[in-house]
Structures are given as structure tokens and as C-alpha cells.
A protein has these predicted regions:
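Intrinsically disordered, low-complexity Pro/Gly/Ser/Thr-rich segments with frequent PxxP/GP/PP motifs
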Residues: 107-157
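A structural signal for short beta-strand/turn segments enriched in small hydrophobics and glycine
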Residues: 273-275, 329-341
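Acidic, glycine-rich catalytic/binding loops that coordinate metals and/or anionic ligands
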Residues: 191-209, 217-221, 251, 268, ...
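Terminal connector regions
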Residues: 151-195
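Short, solvent-exposed loop/turn segments enriched in Ser/Thr/Gly
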Residues: 57-59, 69-76
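Short histidine-centered loop motifs in beta-beta connectors
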Residues: 268, 308, 312-335
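Asparagine-centered strand-capping/turn motif at beta-strand->loop junctions
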Residues: 78-86, 96
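Zn2+-dependent peptidoglycan hydrolase active-site motif and core
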Residues: 261-262, 272-320
Length: 369
């Protein structure tokens, strides 16, 4: 989360994820899309050579239906120029291998300044900002970066069982291969339905900031290099805050945590589960100031992690000091009190950072819808 003065920049772009997309039945008889170099109908791909290689960031692609009525397939790919000469991406298409690699869905992503960054790579060598200055279609030799996708469909049933990328690249300095068009082997789209949860708090006035999927904001932007891999550890995370009828998040100037409307709110279990991780004694941060000297373990601040079963973990971050009421090993029911909302850890303003993860971590994980 940014400072109080920047808080409402992200509200309009936040997307509530309301309905699960369950492709399990529809895709149960789909071909094995992980078979190398074959299309959905079993034909071999033509062998093509190009300078770029890419792979999925995270453990999978998880479709979900949003409050806009569209089904969203949000994911990220790491691109690397494996050759020594610069290469320029001319176009990137998401295609359906089961339909002879026809384009599928509508892909569009924007920066926090509403700049179109579709088909551009957030380069590792550029400053880490969330505006278009971090992105480019040109990748130097040996350089890498991340490309973000939000592929939307009118209906959940329109989401394919697998996708590939068709990438058209030019490399004028390469006299032997100045141009290439490569279609990657297919990647399965998860058939796992999004989990349906109870709210993590009571009352009115709550809004979801920094939500998925169109805007590459503070959560979707994050791809952490942890334990040798890049993880989209916050791609579906939400910063929950509370505002009044005037759209203000605090009573006066927001300079103290207690001045914020959401501070001290009771946080509730969203589903039955087991407490697997707790931190409770970190101090609150001063709103508007960037925290210093935090260890990696302290980034989520005081927090509770619930094992919901089925490889899903609910994480409540930035809780108030000394307010966590549960302990590791406790069993909780939906609606049970876990503690109070605060401003501890890597935060510049009180809010509840909430996410579902495939592992009990806010860093070494793929966030789930």
C-alpha cells in the first residue's frame, strides 16, 4: 500500500473476485497439453527458432469470474533473450492449441497511471516502478523481464483448457534470422474452482484496493525471486480498507494508525481451518513513512495464517500488536475472531492485506483466487 495521499488512486482499478470458474468437467477429457511439441489435436508443432524463451511465473493459471461479469485469466510470463543481440517483440497473441492456435480471449493490462502495457516486458534492468517507464518491447541480449496478462472472456465456459503464446520477434542485427514467429508448447489452465469465503470483517464501508486483474498495481506487479524461482505471490491479494460516505479513509489527517477508520476492526476467520502460523508482537508503523530494517519474516507484520485444506491458505497481514487471539494448532470456525486490524510490517497505512495462497507464505507462494 502507498501513503495515505495515494490511497484512493487504486480503488477504481480494484476488481472484486466474486464467482468461481470451474472447468473441471469441461476439461476432464482434454488432451494432455503438457505433451511436448504437439498441438491440441495431436499434430506436431513446426520447429521454429527465435531469440526469446519464456515460462510461466508461478505454479499455475487460475481463471476466476470478476464483479465486471467477465471471466479473467490473469498470469505472468518471464521472458529472456537467450542470444547476444537485442530483440524486439512486435506482437504477442494468446492462442488456443485445441483450436489450431486461433487467438483466444481479449488480453489487456494497464499501469497504475492507466498506460497500456499490453505485450510489454517489465525489464529487470530498469528501475522498479509501476508506470510504463519500467516496460519495453525491446530486450537486450541476455536480459530478462516479466510480461503480464489479463485475458478476459464473456463467459466462464469460454475459457480454454490450455493456452499457448504466439510471439513475433524482430532482430535486425541478426543477419541469419532477422525475424521469427514462435508458438510455445501449451500450458494447462487450472480446473480448480476459486474458493468461496465468508467476509473477514463485519460492517459497511469496506472497499477492496489493489485488486486483480486489469491494472498491474502493487499486488500484480510483485514477482518475488524466492528460493531460486519467481513467484506471483500477491497476484490475487486485496488490501481491505474502510472509507466513509465522503470517500475518506481516516477521521482527521491520517498521521496515526488510530485515526484510520479501519484500525482496530475485528478480523474474522473466512472459513473453517487450522492456525499454522502466527506473529503477534511487532509494533505498528507510522502511516505515510516507509518501514525500515524489516527482516523478510517481518514483511507481513503481525499475521495469522489458516490452513483451509485442499492446498489453500488464508493469510491476514499487518494486524495490530498484541491483539492476535489464536495460537498455532487452534481449530477455528468461519466467523471466529482472530485479532484486530493494524499497521505492522511492510505497510504505510492501516489495512488488512488478505490473500489465499498455495503455501503458508506471503513470499514463497502463488496467490490463488
Amino acid at each position: 500500500m502507498k501513503s495515505a495521499s495515494h490511497l484512493l488512486i487504486f480503488l477504481a482499478a480494484g476488481l472484486s473476485l466474486l464467482h468461481p470458474v470451474n472447468a473441471q468437467n469441461r476439461c476432464s477429457h482434454a488432451p494432455d497439453y503438457f505433451a511436448p511439441l504437439t498441438t491440441g489435436d495431436g499434430q506436431r508443432y513446426p520447429l521454429t527458432i527465435g531469440p526469446l524463451v519464456w515460462h510461466l511465473v508461478g505454479s499455475g493459471m487460475y481463471p476466476v469470474k470478476g464483479s465486471d461479469g467477465l471471466a479473467h485469466l490473469a498470469f505472468a510470463m518471464q521472458f529472456t533473450n537467450s542470444w547476444g543481440l537485442p530483440a524486439t517483440i512486435q506482437s504477442v497473441e494468446v492462442v488456443d492449441p485445441a483450436q489450431h492456435n486461433k487467438p483466444t480471449g481479449t488480453n489487456r493490462v494497464i499501469s497504475i497511471k492507466d498506460e497500456d502495457v499490453t505485450g510489454l516486458v517489465k525489464l529487470s534492468s530498469l528501475r522498479s516502478s509501476m508506470d510504463k517507464a519500467s516496460y519495453s518491447s525491446k530486450i537486450a541480449g541476455g536480459e530478462s523481464g516479466v510480461m503480464y496478462f489479463d485475458v478476459t472472456y464473456p463467459n466462464s465456459d469460454d475459457v480454454p483448457c490450455a493456452i499457448s503464446l504466439r510471439v513475433h520477434t524482430t532482430q535486425p542485427e541478426n543477419k541469419r534470422l532477422p525475424e521469427s514467429a514462435v508458438v510455445s508448447p501449451p500450458l494447462k489452465v487450472s480446473s480448480q474452482a476459486a474458493i468461496v469465503l465468508a467476509p473477514p470483517f463485519k460492517g459497511e464501508g469496506w472497499v477492496d484496493a489493489n485488486g486483480c486483474c486489469l491494472e498491474i498495481g502493487p499486488h500484480r506487479f510483485v514477482t518475488n525471486p524466492v528460493n531460486g524461482t519467481l513467484d506471483p505471490s500477491e497476484q490475487f491479494a486485496i488490501d481491505w480498507i474502510k472509507i466513509d460516505s465522503q470517500g475518506k479513509a481516516f477521521r482527521t489527517d491520517g498521521k496515526t494508525p488510530e485515526d484510520w477508520l479501519c484500525y482496530g476492526a475485528e478480523l474474522l476467520a473466512v472459513a473453517p481451518g487450522t492456525v499454522v502460523e502466527v506473529m503477534r508482537d511487532l509494533p505498528d508503523q507510522t502511516p505515510g513513512a516507509a518501514p525500515e530494517n524489516l527482516t523478510i519474516e517481518e514483511f507481513p507484520g503481525n499475521h495469522v495464517t489458516l490452513d483451509l485444506g485442499g492446498g489453500r491458505y488464508a493469510i491476514y497481514a499487518h494486524m495490530a500488536p498484541h491483539t492476535v487471539t489464536v495460537h498455532v494448532g487452534d481449530r477455528v470456525r468461519a466467523g471466529d475472531k482472530l485479532g484486530l486490524l493494524g499497521n505492522s510490517g511492510n505497510t504505510t497505512g492501516p489495512h488488512l492485506h488478505f490473500q489465499i495462497s498455495d503455501r503458508p507464505s506471503t513470499l514463497d507462494t502463488t496467490a490463488l483466487p
